[in-house]
Amino acid sequence: MSIEVKGVKKTYGDFSVSLDFSVNKGETLALVGPSGSGKTTALNLISGISAPEEGRIIVDGEDISVLPAWKRNISVVFQDLALFPHLDVGGNIAYGLFIRKIPRKERLRIVEEALGTVRLSGYARRRIDTLSGGERQRVAIARALASKPRALLLDEPFSSLDAPLRKELRREFLEIRSRSDAPCVFVTHDREEAAIVADRIALIAGGRIIETASVREIFSEPKTEFAARFFGAGQVLPCRVLEKRHEGFEVSSPLGILTVMTPSEFNSEKPMIFIPCEGFSFNNLDKAGWKNFNARVTNSIFEGSKLSVKLLLPPWVSGQNQIVNEQISFELAANPREKIPESGGNMDIWIDQSLIRFVR
């Protein structure tokens, strides 16, 4: 089983989407992006709620682009869950099975199996309005899985829950998800949630997929400036490319002269570099490939287990001959034996140049 979205286009007034992506059997793809980027539209097109104007949607080798929603056997968990208040838990889970004319005895067996999967055994006769928020989420997921769907789509299913419950349900979702081979598209605007639930992440903006990669790659090795800034797992800085050397490109940046050792494409008109969080150290590292710089602390906040530090870098002349005063922010693990950097003071930082890469 797999999902392939090929050249799919849809226009709503001034907004249009143009989508190309795929999801493999048993894989969860997190579709991540800012509000209004086209995430929910993508789900509507796959599920059949909306029809594409161009392109093809292929599920398990079959082109389903022209099939009505009820013939696609694709389950959707909506943000508002869309549970039927007049039906009990079992009735909600069995609703799709009833529509498909599955015999009653088989429906009851599937309902009990689905409830066991989401740890709600014995809840079949419970009313929806007696359930907690987390229990309702589990019922919605059980209903989605009961029909053995060809694909599973979730539209920000945990966004209305408080933080501790969201964290708990993310872990449970991973366990539940491991029992199904159906390809899954999980829409969220939460970067942490995407990193936890997904195998790969597709970043969408303006109705277009900007970048698709594994969770580790998109956080630590983004290829685009938009992805680097959106996921915020490092620092994005302007630079001037000075020359190409044997070990890489030498660049001038607000951090000083650096060497970009990892080969990657860059925008020759507006080159940018990305340094992941693990590429910085606040301990004195006199090792090959590491470069030291000094910056002024403009803000330092102790937050219990961590420190939030904002640094003002020395003035730097950009490629457009403009003087740039960049600020960068870090979160550091708080060490009670180390002195907390004070605002107005200076601190030394070391950079692992082997982790620097261009973003376009």
Roles of regions detected by a PLM:
Residues 3-13, 17, 57, 298-300:
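Conserved beta1/A-loop at the N-terminus of ABC ATPase nucleotide-binding domains
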Residues 40-43, 139:
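ABC ATPase nucleotide-binding domain helices that frame the ATP-binding cleft
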Residues 47:
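Helix-to-loop junction immediately C-terminal to a conserved catalytic motif
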Residues 73-75, 79, 86-226:
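ABC ATPase nucleotide-binding domains
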Residues 32-34:
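The feature captures the beta-strand-to-loop junction immediately N-terminal to the Walker
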Residues 13, 234, 244-360:
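Non-catalytic connector elements of ABC transporters
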Residues 55-63:
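Conserved ABC transporter NBD signature motif
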